[in-house]
């Protein structure tokens, strides 16, 4: 990236995060991660906003105390943290004065619809999902404050940036067609090269588009919808299933804190959907026997089948104490898949 990336970070912090002079702002990202640099430091400072930096471990009560003590008005955090706050219970929120909160945003991975509904219930306002990548250097598609939110959508491209859904040859696709989320190059914060890997850098571009590696679709109103990483999409019984939609359906069940979904090779169906699920603490305490666990698995499979297409439910479910994640909170499906298939795990940092 070049130094002019701060232009995009400044503008999007103003437009999307709605930062104002009088705000007290908290971006919960690690300062060493790209979001920490772009929006905990550069985006907030360039807008003249006071920012909280907290280096401690995640603790729901501690987080609410910080929001209360420092009168935080704009809060930018990760879906994983939101789900953990949901799991901690709503009663904890009532112990603190959070009336100064006016704008909530999320970053790092897709935002499950259930998390948006929860924030409306407990904070009186939705979390606004934002989409971008290390390679893009700044927010590219988002739900900004002036927009009506379609729960589950990534939102729309930020002003000055052109986004589209394209096929593998870089040709634009129609409304509600699954394809690659792509951007027209040359926005200020776009990466300029990959160090010592020029061919890798070139591989990101096709027919005048930057190909993000994420799959999605665009509806008739211009809202973008995330399906999954291109290499995460599951092909089962001749159908394509994005892991995010299955994970979101599972998380909507009251017994589930979070879920990670992979495709597992199957001789009959090509792949089957396997889900790794973290259960609510109260459910774990009441579930001691194998028959009880099997009953919950069956209940979850039927729940997903009821809310999604008949082929999109998990045929295997495994309960976990926690899911492998990056420092930024993204669920590392590739590590879960490597463990499941007995393959080398590789780098566990990103």
Residue ranges of each PLM-predicted region?
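Active-site glycine-centered loops adjacent to acidic/histidine catalytic or metal-binding residues
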Residues: 108, 132, 155, 214, ...
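Glycine-centered tight turns that cap/initiate beta-strands
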Residues: 100, 124, 160, 255-258, ...
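AMP-binding/adenylate-forming catalytic core of the ANL superfamily
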Residues: 68, 75, 187, 192-193, ...
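Acidic/polar alpha-helix N-cap and adjacent early helical turns
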Residues: 339-350
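Gly/Ser/Thr-rich phosphate-binding loop
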Residues: 14, 20-22, 46-49, 72-77, ...
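Conserved AMP-binding/adenylation subdomain of ANL enzymes
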Residues: 7-27, 31-74, 88
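Thr-Gly-centered strand-to-loop micro-motif
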Residues: 27-28, 53-54, 105-107, 166-168, ...
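Conserved ATP/PPi-binding loop(s) of AMP-dependent carboxylate-activating enzymes
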Residues: 157-160, 171-203, 239-241, 343-344
């Amino acid at each position: 990236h070049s130094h002019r990336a701060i232009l995009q970070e400044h503008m999007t912090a103003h437009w999307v995060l709605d930062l104002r002079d009088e705000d007290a702002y908290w971006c919960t990202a690690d300062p060493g991660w790209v979001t920490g640099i772009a929006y905990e430091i550069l985006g907030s400072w360039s807008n003249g906003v006071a920012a909280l930096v907290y280096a401690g471990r995640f603790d729901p009560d501690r987080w609410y105390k910080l929001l209360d003590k420092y009168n935080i008005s704009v809060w930018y955090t990760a879906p994983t943290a939101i789900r953990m706050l949901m799991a901690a219970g709503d009663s904890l929120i009532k112990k603190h004065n959070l009336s100064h909160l006016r704008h909530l945003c999320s970053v790092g991975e897709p935002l499950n619809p259930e998390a948006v509904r929860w924030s409306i219930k407990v904070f009186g306002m939705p979390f606004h999902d934002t989409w971008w990548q290390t390679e893009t250097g700044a927010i590219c598609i988002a739900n900004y404050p002036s927009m009506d939110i379609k729960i589950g959508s990534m939102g729309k491209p930020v002003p000055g940036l052109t986004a589209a859904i394209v096929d593998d040859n870089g040709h634009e696709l129609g409304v509600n067609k699954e394809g690659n989320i792509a951007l027209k190059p040359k926005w200020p914060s776009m990466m300029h090269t990959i160090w010592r890997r020029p061919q890798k850098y070139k591989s990101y571009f096709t027919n005048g588009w930057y190909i993000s590696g994420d799959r999605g679709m665009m509806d008739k109103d211009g809202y973008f919808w995330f399906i999954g990483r291109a290499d995460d999409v599951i092909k089962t019984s001749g159908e394509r299933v994005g892991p995010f939609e299955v994970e979101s359906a599972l998380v909507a069940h009251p017994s589930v804190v979070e879920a990670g979904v992979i495709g597992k090779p199957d001789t009959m169906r090509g792949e089957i959907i396997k889900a790794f699920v973290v259960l609510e603490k109260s459910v774990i305490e009441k579930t001691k026997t194998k028959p009880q666990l099997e009953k919950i698995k069956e209940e979850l499979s039927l729940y997903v089948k009821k809310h999604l297409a008949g082929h999109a439910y998990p045929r295997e479910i495994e309960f976990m104490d926690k899911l492998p994640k990056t420092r930024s909170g993204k669920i590392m499906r590739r590590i879960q898949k490597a463990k499941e298939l007995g393959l080398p795990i590789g780098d566990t940092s990103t």
